[in-house]
Amino acid sequence: MRALWVLGLCCVLLTFGSVRADDEVDVDGTVEEDLGKSREGSRTDDEVVQREEEAIQLDGLNASQIRELREKSEKFAFQAEVNRMMKLIINSLYKNKEIFLRELISNASDALDKIRLISLTDENALSGNEELTVKIKCDKEKNLLHVTDTGVGMTREELVKNLGTIAKSGTSEFLNKMTEAQEDGQSTSELIGQFGVGFCSAFLVADKVIVTSKHNNDTQHIWESDSNEFSVIADPRGNTLGRGTTITLVLKEEASDYLELDTIKNLVKKYSQFINFPIYVWSSKTETVEEPMEEEEAAKEEKEESDDEAAVEEEEEEKKPKTKKVEKTVWDWELMNDIKPIWQRPSKEVEEDEYKAFYKSFSKESDDPMAYIHFTAEGEVTFKSILFVPTSAPRGLFDEYGSKKSDYIKLYVRRVFITDDFHDMMPKYLNFVKGVVDSDDLPLNVSRETLQQHKLLKVIRKKLVRKTLDMIKKIADDKYNDTFWKEFGTNIKLGVIEDHSNRTRLAKLLRFQSSHHPTDITSLDQYVERMKEKQDKIYFMAGSSRKEAESSPFVERLLKKGYEVIYLTEPVDEYCIQALPEFDGKRFQNVAKEGVKFDESEKTKESREAIEKEFEPLLNWMKDKALKDKIEKAVVSQRLTESPCALVASQYGWSGNMERIMKAQAYQTGKDISTNYYASQKKTFEINPRHPLIRDMLRRIKEDEDDKTVLDLAVVLFETATLRSGYLLPDTKAYGDRIERMLRLSLNIDPDAKVEEEPEEEPEETTEDTTEDTEQDEDEEMDVGTDEEEQETAKESTAEKDEL
């Protein structure tokens, strides 16, 4: 009986246990439904959680926060010039909108450079966020694009100052250059980055821009603008960035393509793959992973195994979880620029296309470079460098030459960007060269001013100049003459003047026009190769144009004898040649100055001496009487064949071209002692003994030295020679009077004959009467009109009374 009672109790217990088990299955099923029947949501993978939090931080504000932001924010108006600039940028670059991402990433890179530089001397600078990255996230659902950097960030004042009065000092210049580029049909996209107004390009694709920024010295603030006005407010969310800046673009409808991951990735690789900080894009990929089997399947197997007595023993042993392979979409930050800094790689491993892409990314130019050189310098200082020569000269290359930042060399120390604002990394005349320099030998934790005085910088500069000149020398002749010289020829001439140590190297790069060819330019090496057998000087003539130089009386005999003459047609040319004492052992000779001599035979020498003796009376008469106090001396010329005379400067005096340049200087006040000394130097008056005018003058002065006509002729010849020789006349009225007197004599008109006086006009008597009649008629017409108006007014008044 007791056995039956025990058996019944066991059955009851088994039944109750089965019901509890079923209840537990139902509860688990309800939980699964609440979680979407997914076990992924219950995972606690730390890396997944961290990635999700990073993605959430990049999202925009919620509705209540946006409402609070707009209600409490302080409103500002853009400056008029900034408004104009924004409109110009938006309208001129509408076909090249994609550059907005290049500019935003470039700004982010600059901010990262700044905080990294600060961290070298401030150990707490990176405490808010030790990561130095740029992150980009597309939000298709909300139509937002986020670009976040962990750079230096901006305070409230900096948000207003930097984003509200964009490019303060350069705004006007930028507008002018933008307008010029549009008028010339040139590309304007590179101007955006060059003038520091790249942030404005965000409005090419965005209706609204929101900038969230956290600086170490301020709380987090939000700057918002629709391109018409902007507002700033403290971020109601508090410090969500740690440090840095997030730029959120509310994209225009037609710019939705920039929310596509492939588009963003392609743009990053196109424009920013050589940025020195990692750039990440929040992107997805499909992975095959092993997941535990569903609990229902596991429970079913456990139920089947519970019927087997052997399963009791196996339950005590550790079981391996059963899994299955499934495909799932995983979101993570994908690195876009994993390429090592190009200058750190061996030059043999870098393709030409990589150099071109790096140049465009780093210089913000749209054209390929004309030339480049990649080298490692060793010795007193070791550094790596890449230098580029642009295809065209930067705009405003000589504006304020030497008085502001004039080079485009970025200095890195151990891959840390230090500055691009050194004034003497390259000499002024090479201010068009762009590149990077990276050295491990320079100190990191010093100020820029201290670093600028570091002795190793002088060594680096010296090597950079040598390598640059080697690079330029290797440019193909056709490209050099057709492109480089047109763009940068003036720089090379300035280098000859300024750089004494490299003057010989620079002289080989000079190009000038010459009498050898009507259009082609020539080098000094080529000139020397073509020199005559006994020619020991390089002849040159300076003028405002080639036509003026080749028609000068000074080159007549040289050209007739077959000598090649170099024509200097630019204002800087004569300074350049004056700075060159010689080239390849040949001295330079300005044919407008004393010293032009030709190799002559004994017979020719005797003939010349006989002519000088024959014309000695005329020469003495000119020096002592006709042109007294005007010339140093008068001599028989060896350089004239067609012209009657010329005015020749001394070896240390000014030529006509130089005098014209000096007197045209804006700062010329007439009080400079050296300038006045050169300007007052008397010239040598050379005559052509074979010219009929000169021969007739000799005859006349032998007959009568006091002949007024001959005296006038001598002065007119002197003044004409002054003009032909390139000088300016001090008294043009007197010159004009003398020419008129000579014309009167040639036409047999009395030199004292007066100009006929104009007859006096008689006054018209009827004018006053006619005027009075006209005024009377007008008065009568006005009276009649007034009477008619008064009658009409009276009628209207009567009618109104009748109606009342």
UniProtKB/Swiss-Prot annotation:
It comes from Pongo abelii (Sumatran orangutan). The modification N6-succinyllysine is found at K404, K633. ATP-dependent chaperone involved in the processing of proteins in the endoplasmic reticulum, regulating their transport. Together with MESD, acts as a modulator of the Wnt pathway by promoting the folding of LRP6, a coreceptor of the canonical Wnt pathway. When associated with CNPY3, required for proper folding of Toll-like receptors. Promotes folding and trafficking of TLR4 to the cell surface. Residues 288-323, 750-804 are annotated as: Disordered. Phosphorylated by CK2. Gene3D superfamilies: 3.30.230.80, 3.40.50.11260, Heat shock protein 90, C-terminal domain, Histidine kinase-like ATPase, C-terminal domain. Its main location: endoplasmic reticulum. The modification N6-(2-hydroxyisobutyryl)lysine is found at K168. Glycans are attached at N62, N107, N217, N445, N481, N502. This is Endoplasmin. PANTHER family: HEAT SHOCK PROTEIN 90 FAMILY MEMBER. The modification Phosphoserine is found at S64, S172, S306, S403, S447. Pfam families: HATPase_c_3, HSP90. A motif (Prevents secretion from ER) lies at residues 801-804. GO terms for molecular function: ATP binding; ATP hydrolysis activity; ATP-dependent protein folding chaperone; unfolded protein binding. SMART domains: HATPase_c.
